Amino acid sequence: MPQTPPFSAMFDSSGYNRNLYQSAEDSCGGLYYHDNNLLSGSLEALIQHLVPNVDYYPDRTYIFTFLLSSRLFMHPYELMAKVCHLCVEHQRLSEGDGDKNQMRKIAPKILQLLTEWTETFPYDFRDERMMRNLKDLAHRMASGEEQTYRKNVQQMMQCLIRKLAALSQYEEVLAKLSSTATDRLTVLKTKPQSIQRDIMTVCSDPYTLAQQLTHIELERLNYIGPEEFVQAFVQKDPLDNDKSCYSERKKTRNLEAYVEWFNRLSYLVATEICMPVKKKHRARMIEYFIDVARECFNIGNFNSLMAIISGMNMSPVSRLKKTWAKVKTAKFDILEHQMDPSSNFYNYRTALRGAAQRSLTAHSSREKIVIPFFSLLIKDIYFLNEGCVNRLPNGHVNFEKFWELAKQVSEFMTWKQVECPFERDRKVLQYLLSVPVFSEDALYLASYESEGPENNIEKDRWKSLRSSLLGRV
């Protein structure tokens, strides 16, 4: 079977490969081109353009873009059914002509399309209807006269089943972490001795902590399917009368789990800073996290960097003026400048481009690491989706929009496939993922207990929190 190129090779700087389509295709029914670039088409014509025949195989860029965006218009199992039907029709035509050479030409192309679908969008096949169609078509290919494809079909199915099994295992771990999560204050009330344990007793080296954070980031990134970026913004297609499949398509559990990790890390940072009783210990903890954040920046782990900065900027932490007075903040000021939201995060975007360029020319796994500030990536995709229509006035699919969407998502796909080069420290990872953190109210209470309220509003809140959380007046 032909080898598929890496995602980074799929799109040029303009958003898509400009040399995919020959001028002879300009007159293809239902597809509209400009300067040989596919701009729009009817949904039916785009589906036909996806399916290979004896003389044609779609470019990988088109396959990825259409499989990614088609779920805005139809459920993947509906697309799979149409693709299977067209593939079977092509096979029948070849068989009807009695030309075995034609069969030999088309079978590997169909198998390659199915392989690309299962490799890039494996989560589509959690749907039994998808898996049934895939097995039916794969069986048809493997049981024909051409037995040479049986091994390739088996490899494709085994690889898909492994990926789905790994996803199920990952989801079980997430569910277990979620079910055992408790509030830090509750733990301290029942086990006061646990207050002695903090992040610095578990991992005294900020560089090691930054590396372990990168492990968590890359693992969670790896489980996000590219389709989740589209499914997060699925809305009812006005030309679609099936109301039920809209809600079915909105599956974004791994994306949501990653956003929850960002929030957890921010709260963990704030908890670790607010928990120490002594001012010098709080100041030391702030400086520790500044060093962790700086190393995250050097690694290219912008998501952990931003989570740490967010935690340090939470009100219960930022109000600790006496503590901050003891902190050397020069390094923190530089990091805040890098992640400054002004001018649409211009400084961060510049740093991200630099990291992405470094990744392309990398000589080591460490240099390949690019972990974007995830919430901003989601926001960019959201505004791209909101800023352009999915369908043109004539009912055609606005494919120009989806080239750009696919460009952004394919870049993410390249980054998420990087293997973490750092040694795993299970003790540190366990602490980061499972140690209880303070709720927002508990953070404020700890902050007021460390440095008393400065005005009447804070005094009233302190009294209220002591009463509700500690049962004290």
UniProtKB/Swiss-Prot annotation:
Function, as annotated: Guanine nucleotide exchange factor (GEF) with specificity for RAP2A, it doesn't seems to activate other Ras family proteins (in vitro).
Entries under PROSITE patterns matching the protein: RASGEF, RASGEF_CAT, RASGEF_NTER
UniProt note on tissues of expression: Constitutively expressed in brain, intestine and testis. Low constitutive expression, if any, in heart, lung, lymph nodes and thymus. Up-regulated in heart, kidney, liver, lymph nodes, spleen and thymus at day 20 after infection with Trypanosoma cruzi. Not detected in muscle.
Highest rank taxon of the organism: Eukaryota
UniProt KW Ribosomal protein keyword: no
All copies of domain Ras-GEF, residue ranges: 205-453
UniProt subunit comment: Interacts with CCDC124 during cytokinesis. Interacts with Ras family proteins.
Species per Swiss-Prot/TrEMBL record: Mus musculus
Protein location: Early endosome; Late endosome; Midbody
GO-annotated cellular components: early endosome; late endosome; midbody
Pfam family membership, one: RasGEF
Gene: Rasgef1b
Record bears the keyword Transferase: no
Transmembrane annotation, as ranges: none
Coiled-coil zones: none
UniProt domain N-terminal Ras-GEF: residue ranges: 34-161
Sorted UniProt keywords: Endosome, Guanine-nucleotide releasing factor
Protein name: Ras-GEF domain-containing family member 1B
